[in-house]
Amino acid sequence: MKKFTCILLAMSVVFALAGCQKAEKKVVIASKPMAESYIIAEMMGQLIEAHSDINVEYKTGIGGGTSNIQPAMEAGEIDMYPEYTGTGWLFVLKKDLIRDPAELYAEVAKGYMDSYNFKWLELYGFNDTYALSMDRTVAEENGIETYSDLAAASSQFTLGAEYDFYEREDGYPGLVAEYGFAFKETKDIDIGLKYKAIGAGEVDVINNFSTDGLLSEYDLKVLEDDKQFFPAYQAATVIRQETLDKYPELEGILNKLAGQISDEEMQQMNYYVEHDNKEAKLVAKEFLESKGLL
């Protein structure tokens, strides 16, 4: 009986240790306080849990975004999060602007590895940068695809933007110097009212972000910044190298997102969350399933 009891105790210890080891397989994913970041963080977590035995803890909507996530990554409190090349280069590494998107990605990846031992994984595909947009039908009727096209016809149109866009050198003054814009009129419009203004025909062109969810609702065309005036804000997973060393399978799993998300797809997903109030978790799941990734 004593021998049997000892065997049971030994087996209990083995199972308990196995349970502890399994519980230790965990990563922490952070997101910024915006729909896009919530959605991508969910995609990352769902892929990890679907293709490995690693558990995921989410720290969502971290106030201050990069300014608070970066130190938490350095402290090992967060393992990974979705970030933008322009933000990493200009805000974290504090370097001078690089206009070429491919060069920017290569340099920001090198800078993060050298400075923080963080790895930038492959790009998701979309670029959430500053943009100029106009009604799709109007753009097509006038053959406007690029900023240069718009500049050539700008005397016919009215631009709507928030006040500080007209004051910043990396805003309207810089665009005028680069492209030669000469709009018929420029209007100061509150940042939250720009889409309503263009929808009502009060303005013809607005500044915005290229993956804004409302672009879909108002059927606006994001014009191509053909001289690359605005920096690229291409998105990718940033992960601690220590985490990859511990769970090397994560790189292949997370890179399933590489090149999978277009600007238009990200716009639509943002719209579902911001306008239709769908849960980011559900939006992420439906997208991954549509791509055959789950």
Model feature map: region roles:
Residues V92-L121, E202, L214-Q228:
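Ligand-binding "clamshell"
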Residues A35, E57-P71, Y163, K184-K196:
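Short helix-initiation/N-cap motifs at beta->coil->alpha
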Residues A16-G19:
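C-terminal motif of bacterial Sec signal peptides marking the signal peptidase cleavage site
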Residues T129-E140, Q234-Y247:
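A bilobed periplasmic-binding-protein/Venus flytrap-type ligand-binding module shared by bacterial periplasmic
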Residues A50-G61, S155-T158, V176-I189:
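A local structural motif
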Residues L47, S67-I78, P173-E178, I191-I206:
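Short helices/loops that flank or line small-molecule/ion binding pockets
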Residues A23-S37, I54-G61, S155-A161:
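Short, well-ordered beta-strand elements
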Residues L104-T158, G259-D263:
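A conserved helix-loop-strand patch within extracytoplasmic ligand-binding domains
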